[in-house]
């Protein structure tokens, strides 16, 4: 794994978060390099600067290294991005007091002179981010957005024009391009919230823009809902909760239980919390955490059931370390006799991991694509 970042005279040591000793994934990509290279070569840096979708701090650490006194507004939806950026600033002896942190639902300052941004995978989320920028950026503000060259086309430039202002793309470098957008100073309204019904469970659901499954149950959640475990559960964790539909259903089935919703996405946690209220569930029974798996779950929480639909992507990277961490955290935090109940794609072979960790694994249900697995802490 490469940890030495070197671009246009900026030298840093960068790690992904959480650190993985045996991973070949690094904490930055060529789009980070291209964006920083473009910024330095243009000699048009400006303060204050916003940095958006910076996976593990490559951009914010680089800008801080160039000028430690620059005020930076760092916006992220991912808790691991927040923690990784913080970790890498410390690793490189860079100050943190010049950073101001924002989630993707917070309002950025109106005096921004420059925005540096990575293109997210979710284009609905990207449109949301551009719309929020349109509400605060004065006309003429530059926004530089880096992405893989194959992701940039005329349709994407039209998204800029619709939500923020005219844009043009650079030549390709290392299979990436940098888009330069100039804010037109015209604020746009945010998209209206969409609420949809899950009639078979008497639930109403809505998602914020960066939450998986925009307006219907995804297939994995559906098969999980059809195969929830039976028991006398008092403390349940919906780990990687998304919009919270699994936890909402368990709240209906086990009304005496405390339900703990955890996700790396702040928008997911906010969606789950809103859906809890929307479905008129008891306020004192729902608990919500923006966290890296169960890293900061209060010690007094000892679940007897953990529900989990593990992601196998972290940003653009395909990785199984998130699932592995979820399973490790579940084994660590479950009560003796407690159950981990998961859904996953069949080809991911999660049964091997569960057998290794728990020394037992049962197949509860399966179809052509998904499998429901259960392991018990003994």
From Swiss-Prot:
It is found in: Cytoplasm. One of its GO terms (cellular component) is cytoplasm. Its EC number is 2.1.1.174. It catalyses: guanosine(1835) in 23S rRNA + S-adenosyl-L-methionine = N(2)-methylguanosine(1835) in 23S rRNA + S-adenosyl-L-homocysteine + H(+). CDD domains: AdoMet_MTases. Its main location: cytoplasm. The keyword Cytoplasm applies. GO terms for molecular function: 23S rRNA (guanine(1835)-N(2))-methyltransferase activity; nucleic acid binding. It holds the Pfam family MTS. Belongs to the methyltransferase superfamily. RlmG family. Specifically methylates the guanine in position 1835 (m2G1835) of 23S rRNA. This is Ribosomal RNA large subunit methyltransferase G. It comes from Shewanella baltica (strain OS155 / ATCC BAA-1091). The gene is rlmG.
């Amino acid at each position: 794994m490469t940890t030495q970042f070197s671009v246009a005279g900026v030298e840093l040591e960068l790690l992904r978060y959480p650190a993985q000793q045996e991973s070949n994934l690094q904490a930055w990509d060529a789009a980070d390099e291209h964006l920083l290279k473009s910024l330095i070569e243009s000699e048009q840096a400006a303060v204050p600067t916003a940095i958006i979708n910076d996976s593990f701090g490559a951009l914010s650490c680089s800008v801080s290294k160039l000028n430690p006194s620059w005020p930076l507004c760092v916006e992220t939806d991912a808790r691991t991005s927040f923690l990784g950026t913080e970790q890498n600033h410390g690793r490189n002896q860079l100050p943190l007091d010049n950073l101001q942190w924002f989630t993707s639902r917070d309002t950025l300052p109106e005096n921004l002179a420059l925005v540096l941004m990575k293109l997210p995978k979710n284009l609905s989320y990207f449109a949301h981010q551009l719309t929020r920028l349109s509400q605060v950026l004065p006309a003429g503000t530059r926004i530089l957005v880096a992405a893989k060259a194959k992701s940039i086309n005329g349709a994407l430039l039209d998204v800029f024009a619709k939500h923020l202002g005219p844009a043009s793309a650079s030549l390709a470098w290392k299979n990436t391009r940098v888009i330069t957008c100039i804010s037109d100073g015209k604020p746009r309204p945010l998209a209206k919230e969409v609420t949809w019904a899950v009639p078979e469970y008497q639930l109403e659901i809505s998602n914020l823009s960066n939450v998986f499954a925009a307006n219907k149950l995804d297939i994995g959640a559906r098969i999980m809902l059809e195969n929830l475990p039976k028991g006398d559960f008092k403390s349940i964790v919906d780990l990687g909760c998304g919009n919270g539909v699994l936890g909402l259903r368990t709240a209906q089935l086990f009304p005496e239980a405390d339900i703990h919703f955890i996700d790396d996405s702040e928008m997911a946690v906010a969606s789950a919390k809103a859906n809890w209220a929307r479905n008129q569930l008891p306020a004192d029974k729902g608990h919500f955490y923006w966290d890296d798996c169960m890293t900061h779950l209060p010690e007094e929480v000892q679940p007897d059931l953990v529900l989990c639909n593990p992601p196998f992507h972290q940003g653009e990277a395909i990785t199984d370390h998130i699932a592995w961490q979820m399973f490790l955290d579940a084994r660590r935090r479950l009560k003796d006799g407690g159950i981990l109940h998961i859904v996953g794609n069949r080809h991911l072979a999660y049964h091997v991991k569960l057998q290794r960790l728990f020394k037992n694994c049962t197949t509860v249900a399966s179809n052509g694509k998904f499998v429901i697995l259960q392991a018990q802490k003994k």
